[in-house]
A protein has these predicted regions:
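Alpha-helical structural signal in soluble globular domains
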Residues: 33, 57, 61-66, 90, ...
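Residue-level signature of catalytic and energy-coupling elements of molecular machines
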Residues: 17, 159, 280
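C-terminal alpha-helical cap/extension of soluble enzyme domains
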Residues: 4-12, 29, 33-35, 44, ...
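A general structural signal for well-ordered alpha-helical segments in protein cores
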Residues: 23, 55, 59, 84, ...
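Active-site beta->alpha loop and helix N-cap motifs at the rims of alpha/beta catalytic domains
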Residues: 1-7, 11-141
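Short secondary-structure transition/capping segments
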Residues: 50-53, 86, 111-114, 142-144, ...
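Glycine-rich phosphate-binding "P-loop"
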Residues: 133, 155-156, 266-267
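Catalytic alpha/beta core domains of metabolic enzymes, predominantly
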Residues: 123, 137-243
Length: 290
């Protein structure tokens, strides 16, 4: 069971190449700030625009630099089942604690296809698997029945839910059970998610505010929701501003502002507008980050 806030790590680039020095330093910054776990090469890590070799390298660097201080849930999803199996097995071989596998995007499988996809990955790997349900990006939305069926497969352990439907926390608990690991994939609704019984979150905001996010989550995990709400109030402007333009553009800008890495993105993502930069600056000041 994974609990706490896991950072959906940015992937630093420099002059078109992965910046390993900045990545290792950034991982240290996250761990030293109290973050509970790390998630390399998910959407926030620009997984669609890294090569296979870079994808695998990012996972290897993260596992090596974390050095078992915190768990690593490696992003290994693909809309090609065979590719997802390959990436999942690589993460397992290198020592990841689990794999985060997004629902297939663009080819839009139905519920039977979703079940077959995850079943094949699980049966061909030995690592715990988290389903990543994000219909806003993948178009498909895994329903409760399919998720319940998949949980019967021994190494499928839970979900990162980025649907913003808070009622699903209760539905999953009541139908699938308390042992189904539920992590929020939406920073702005994490407080409500936790009050409904969630176990933690995979966060974008924690890239730039790991201490605030980990303090917030520690309060949630101990049931101190009134105190957690005060920190959430500081973070809410950030939660909103970091998605004013396609992510991770705004959060990479903020990371550069803090001296953590370059804001360099890979096409088709482009530099954010001045208006968005101003909004992010304002939110960072409100959270006392700058």
């Amino acid at each position: 069971m994974f609990k706490g806030v896991f950072t959906a790590l940015l992937t630093p680039f420099k002059n078109g190449e992965m910046d390993e020095v900045s990545f290792r330093s950034f991982i240290d910054f996250q761990i030293e700030s109290g973050i509970h776990g790390l998630v390399p090469v998910g959407t926030t890590g620009e997984s669609p625009t890294v090569s296979h070799d870079e994808h695998k390298l990012a996972v290897e660097i993260c596992i090596d630099q974390a050095n078992k201080k915190v768990p690593v849930i490696a992003g290994t999803g693909s809309n090609n089942t065979a590719e997802a199996i390959e990436l999942t097995n690589h993460a397992s071989e290198k020592g990841a604690d689990a794999a985060l596998v997004v629902t297939p995007y663009y080819n839009k499988p139905n519920q039977e296809g979703l079940y077959a996809h995850y079943k094949a990955i699980a049966e061909n790997s030995d690592i715990p698997i988290m389903i990543y349900n994000i219909p806003g990006r993948s178009i498909v939305d895994m329903n409760l029945e399919t998720m319940n069926k998949l949980f019967q497969i021994k190494n499928i352990i839970g979900v990162k839910d980025a649907t913003s439907d808070i009622s699903r926390v209760f539905k999953y608990k009541s139908i699938i059970g308390d042992s189904f690991n539920q992590l929020s994939g939406e920073d702005a609704t994490t407080l409500a998610y936790m009050t409904y019984g969630g176990h933690g979150s995979i966060s974008v905001t924690s890239n730039i505010a790991p201490k605030l996010c980990s303090d917030f989550m520690n309060l949630c995990l101990t049931g101190k929701f009134d105190e957690a709400s005060k920190i959430n109030d500081k973070l809410m402007k950030l939660h909103e501003c970091l998605f004013l333009e396609p992510s991770p553009g705004p959060v990479k800008y903020a990371a550069e502002k803090l001296g953590l890495m370059s804001s360099e993105l890979r096409l088709p993502l482009v530099e954010i507008s001045k208006n968005t930069k101003d909004r992010v600056d304002e939110a960072m000041k409100f959270a006392l980050l700058i």
